[in-house]
UniProtKB/Swiss-Prot annotation:
Gene3D superfamilies found in the cross-reference section: BH3618-like
One of the protein's GO biological processes: regulation of translation
Protein's cellular compartments: Cytoplasm
Keywords: Bacterial flagellum biogenesis, Chaperone, Cytoplasm, Translation regulation
SUPFAM superfamilies xref list: BH3618-like
Function: Acts as an anti-CsrA protein, binds CsrA and prevents it from repressing translation of its target genes, one of which is flagellin. Binds to flagellin and participates in the assembly of the flagellum.
Sequence similarity: Belongs to the FliW family.
CC annotations in GO: cytoplasm
Organism: Thermoanaerobacter pseudethanolicus (strain ATCC 33223 / 39E) (Clostridium thermohydrosulfuricum)
Keyword Cytoplasm appears in the UniProt entry: yes
Keyword Transcription attached: no
Name of the protein this chain belongs to: Flagellar assembly factor FliW
Amino acid sequence: MQINTKNFGIIEYNPDDVIYFEEGIPGFEDLHNFLIITDNREDMPFKWLQAIDNTDIAFVVIDPRVFKPNYTFEIDEELIQALQIEDINHLLIYVIVVIPDEIEKMTANLKAPIIINAKNNKGKQAILDNDEYLIKHPILEELKNAYSNA
């Protein structure tokens, strides 16, 4: 199958790769089907969560453990049921990144990670009840440090 996206042009994809968000994503509740688009360069930590239902919508995402290795949170029973989680090793964790014109002000939403069960391709954006994580967590310096230590 293929879609014609605003940011990437025509993309070929396998229907088995579609990630289904039953409730959509907060603010985009009418969008349920997404793809993870990866830049194949090793030095590129960012990916894109591309909506299939509205191909003008794509979110920049990153695994938060790239820049914050100790990023952890509790997985509650509601999330286990919603994503049919049997093994946490099958979970993919991403956070949405905002990259403004002034790149040094780049932030990630650590308060609301996107959790995907890779076993069944079900996804959900969880809202954490945790004051430690910010909605607008600055990440540029942490990314620089992560890559300088690699």
